[in-house]
Amino acid sequence: NGLASVGPLVLILFWLIQSMPTFMGRELHALHNLGVGLFGVAASGLPSPELYPVYHWFLSALSLIPGIDSLSLAAYIPGVQPTAGLEQISGYPVQLLPLASALSALFLILLTWALARATGNDRRTAFASGLVLLTGFACMGLPRISGSDMLFTAILTLAGICLYRGWIKAFAPLWLFAGFALVALSALAGGLLGLVLPLLVSLVFLLWRGTFRRAGARDGALAFGLLLVLLLAWGTFIAFGDGGRELLKTLLENEYLAPVLEAWKLQGQDSWIIVALLAVLWLPWTLLLLFLPWGRIGTFFKGIVVNRKQRPGQGWLWCSAIVTLAVLALLGANMPVLLMPLLPPLAVLTAQGVLNLSARGSRGF
């Protein structure tokens, strides 16, 4: 309880410890060797100049901070300084890239804590959610996973928090405007998933609560209009720039239409892959399933149904986790990094399960 009262500070401390290899520059040569991988980034966080502008904006903003490169301890430790020719990668100082990944990880950790608090959980559960995220196989060594994917997930999580706060109120234009603006940003940070996931989660959540008419209220309609205006404005601005039409064509064909066409072709044939990946990458927390009180599972879900209006936060977490997993399975996702959007709500639900274990279950786990 004492640590939970200062949970964000403790999580920042643990993030700093996990980030030490990053700050020491251990990835600098690996960044160059890995090159640019699928979806515009390699495992190192290198952005592709053709795709997803938000990570570029983030890197550009960081590069404007005076002395930002000096945060990397690689500048002061013999043997890890970049060799000749590696000082610049993708137009950015090479030492900036690991720092950007580490900061993206910090945003994701703190927003997982914020998601737990926003959905009505106490400080203990929120603190435990951050610890679960930090200690799962999927996120162990979190700062060295692709920075662009973590930044996308952080934006998506913040958009979800704003939308949730807006949907549970009768009139909340500020929350919904912020939420849909962040949805537009997440669409430019992660492609199709950034656009589809928050809209589908909102739809399922409103249907679940029996408040679907809330989506057609004036603030909801105006906020959705803001989303369309922002995306159209960005597309128009890019189209009139050098190579803008080719960029838009690449984004639409490869990142928006291609996943839908591939999903139509597969028709769920490879949906088991993402579930199997999740079971492995969420270790050791996957083992929690062995110690849950399955005899009370009916009572548990009955409570969720009965209290769907009194405890909307729980419904939002379950809708987020189920919808995200279903979309990933439908799209035939087969890469671990694509699980990132699922991890924040799953971390909160896992933390709830850990804290509510019986004495026998706790000892067994």
Tell what function each PLM region has.
Residues 1-363:
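Membrane-integral, polyisoprenol-dependent glycosyltransferases
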